[in-house]
């Protein structure tokens, strides 16, 4: 397709998940890259819910067979009697990495007494001033304290936890043979890849190794990398637990555990996995950093079992007037169901020179509207959980690198991802609750002194959601779109769907999934499926009359039941155990 998103572009960043990422110094020989790491990821049907990810991993393990996995004692050039001594030194080193004289009111990175290698990388990334979470979080973390951080997405917390972890690895002179010294646990694969990319930039001048293990990627290649020694490891919970239990690699020297987006990790059902991970990992001399946008009971429980007594609590949001970031203009538009797509189409036509993200409630809706928009010559990228992992990775980095264009997606992209210079966030389908709204709009106006705009589509029967936003301290104003500016292509749309078999089938799937998602909404007092005008809803999918869907079945399905019922492609149902 002819657009800014050139398919011929070589997306170097998209391959980061399959590269070892080790920057070696002059005294260390380079480790050869395993060709298997370049294979495309296994197909995964939905986002990484615990049951699905575990099933997928079991299927991959069966395919791996009885392969001999290397031990985690590392490089051949270091195969001398100093290996054991190095391990002892690591366990005896003082936790404090900075001198007590560092000013706690530092505002510039240059005031932190960081290593020259880290400072050079930070300068090359274009950072000089610290954000509030960095200013308040990095000094105590460098001093070895446990930190419980509360900060909005886009606040700069990735650097806040990576810099202390990298400085620790550098200070202790970690080598591959010393194994894993720091682990970052994050809820989604895309966020793990993004953190990996930031780590790669920060560690370009260091000799320590780094890597990522995520569901949907080649497990065998990951195991081989871990066996060689990965000093900084970024991981999703299910895959990390799998490797901790089944892959021989060195993690006895681990000094730093970082749990990012803890509330989201728990929301999608990884509570049991996190408890097991924390139980397996070494506790002695371990520093833990836990970051969460919201402080729920489950997050407090996780903090209690993972953090040492008396952690430092850093909340950069408690004094803020609003829950969303500054520099973000937020609005909503009231539109009947049958005019929703017409308004979206008109809006995207006008915004083709801007960078726009549009959120939908289901994978099938994303798939259908992506196919439809491209069929009528409005080029978009799409990102959802039914895509292969490699496709999701490529799409994410392609949109990151683009200066303009439209990405339509599900909430797989709504949390934590740092997509540069997004002008508009459009919530075509309503979020599940105000927290999801905040995470979605967090894709724009990220960092200091940045601007962005958001638009929420609401039907007349959904205006009760505004009260929930107000209670969550989210300021929104009503936007008015003149009817004369809305392109009326309804008759052409219905004709197209009636004549094109494949679009027709895709439209039916999208319509069905939209209703099922709507029926499983957590705010059912506001988003009541029985108040929907199905004729008008069907028109937004290009139907003159509604396709048949079992609404009773849909409304009986809860979001949790739907998530836990999903299985990975090719996996088998779990058998009863006696």
From Swiss-Prot:
UniProt entry keywords in alphabetical sequence: ATP-binding, Helicase, Hydrolase, Nucleotide-binding, Nucleus, Ribosome biogenesis, RNA-binding, rRNA processing
Residue ranges, compositional bias (Acidic residues): 43-54, 77-88
Region (Disordered): 1-91, 556-578
Gene3D superfamilies xrefs: P-loop containing nucleotide triphosphate hydrolases
Short motif (Q motif): ranges: 107-135
Name of this chain's protein: ATP-dependent RNA helicase has-1
Family indicated by similarity: Belongs to the DEAD box helicase family. DDX18/HAS1 subfamily.
PANTHER family (alphabetical): RNA HELICASE
The encoding gene: has-1
GO terms assigned for molecular function: ATP binding; ATP hydrolysis activity; identical protein binding; RNA binding; RNA helicase activity
Binding site for ATP: 151-158
Organism the protein comes from: Neurospora crassa (strain ATCC 24698 / 74-OR23-1A / CBS 708.71 / DSM 1257 / FGSC 987)
């Amino acid at each position: 397709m002819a657009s800014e998103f050139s398919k011929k572009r070589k997306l170097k960043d998209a391959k980061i998940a399959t590269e070892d990422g080790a920057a070696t110094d002059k005294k260390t020989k380079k480790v050869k890259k395993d060709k298997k790491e370049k294979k495309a990821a296994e197909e995964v049907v939905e986002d990484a819910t615990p049951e699905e990810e575990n099933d997928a991993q079991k299927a991959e393990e069966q395919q791996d067979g009885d392969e001999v996995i290397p031990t985690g004692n590392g490089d051949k050039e270091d195969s001398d009697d100093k290996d054991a001594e190095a391990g002892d030194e690591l366990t005896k080193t003082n936790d404090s990495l900075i001198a007590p004289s560092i000013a706690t009111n530092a505002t510039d990175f240059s005031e932190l007494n960081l290593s020259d290698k880290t400072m050079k990388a930070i300068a090359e990334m274009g950072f000089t001033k610290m954000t509030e979470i960095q200013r308040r979080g990095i000094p105590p973390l460098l001093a070895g304290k446990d930190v419980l951080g509360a900060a909005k997405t886009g606040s700069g917390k990735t650097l806040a936890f990576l810099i202390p972890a990298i400085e620790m690895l550098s200070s202790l002179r970690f080598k591959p043979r010393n194994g894993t010294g720091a682990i970052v646990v994050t809820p989604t694969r895309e966020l793990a890849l993004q953190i990996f990319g930031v780590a790669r930039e920060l560690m370009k001048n260091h000799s320590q190794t780094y890597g990522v293990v995520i569901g949907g990627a080649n497990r065998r290649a990951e195991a081989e990398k871990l066996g060689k020694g990965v000093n900084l490891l970024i991981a999703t919970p299910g895959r990390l637990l799998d490797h901790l239990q089944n892959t021989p690699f060195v993690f006895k020297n681990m000094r730093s555990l970082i749990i990012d987006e803890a509330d989201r990790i728990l929301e999608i059902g990884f509570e049991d996995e996190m408890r097991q991970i924390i139980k397996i990992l070494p506790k002695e001399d371990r520093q833990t950093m836990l970051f969460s946008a919201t402080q729920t009971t489950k997050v407090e429980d996780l903090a209690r079992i993972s953090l040492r007594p008396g952690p430092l609590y850093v909340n950069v949001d408690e004094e803020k007037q609003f829950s969303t970031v500054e520099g973000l203009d937020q609005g909503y538009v009231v539109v009947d169901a049958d005019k929703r797509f017409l308004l979206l189409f008109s809006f995207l036509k006008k915004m083709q020179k801007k960078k726009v993200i549009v959120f939908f409630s289901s994978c099938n809706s994303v798939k259908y509207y992506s196919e439809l928009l491209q069929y009528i010559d409005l080029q978009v990228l799409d990102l959802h959980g039914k895509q292969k992992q490699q496709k999701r990775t490529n799409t994410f980095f392609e949109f990151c690198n683009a200066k303009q264009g439209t990405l339509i997606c599900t909430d797989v992209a709504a949390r934590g991802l740092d997509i540069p210079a997004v002008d508009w966030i459009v919530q075509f389908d309503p979020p599940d609750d105000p927290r999801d709204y905040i995470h979605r709009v967090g894709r724009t106006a990220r960092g200091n002194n940045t601007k962005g705009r958001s638009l929420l589509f609401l039907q007349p029967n959904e205006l009760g959601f505004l009260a929930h936003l107000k209670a969550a301290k989210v300021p929104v104003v009503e936007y008015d779109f003149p009817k004369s500016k809305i392109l009326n292509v309804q008759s052409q749309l219905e004709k197209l769907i009636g004549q094109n078999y494949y679009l027709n089938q895709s439209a039916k799937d999208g319509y069905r999934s939209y209703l099922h998602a709507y029926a499983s909404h957590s705010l059912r007092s506001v988003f009541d499926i029985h108040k929907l005008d199905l004729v008008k809803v069907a028109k937004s999918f290009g139907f003159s009359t509604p396709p048949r869907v079992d609404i009773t079945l849909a409304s009986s399905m809860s979001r949790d039941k739907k998530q836990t019922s999903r299985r990975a492609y090719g996996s088998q149902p779990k058998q009863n155990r006696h």
